[in-house]
Amino acid sequence: MPRGILVMLDVVVQAQQLEKVTAALEKLPEVVDLHEVTGEYDLVALLQTDSIVEFRRLTHKIQRIEGIKGTNSMVIIHTLKKDGKSVAE
């Protein structure tokens, strides 16, 4: 299991800015996974940081990326299944 803070970050992108925002997010080492999705949000990212303080700094940095209209974050408190397998405690 990874150490630190894991966060699912939903991202709303301004029209015509998806490629630019995606490129900026891909450059951040804390962005572990990045998915383009349907629905209310345009992108979903999995973030991994060492601490909640680092997560706060990262979200402020992400929110300043040109083309990002808004974000919603969910801190992962417990993983039940990963890579198709149950995770035993």
Spans of model-derived segments:
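A compositional/biophysical signature of low hydrophobicity enriched in polar/charged and small residues
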Residues: 1-89
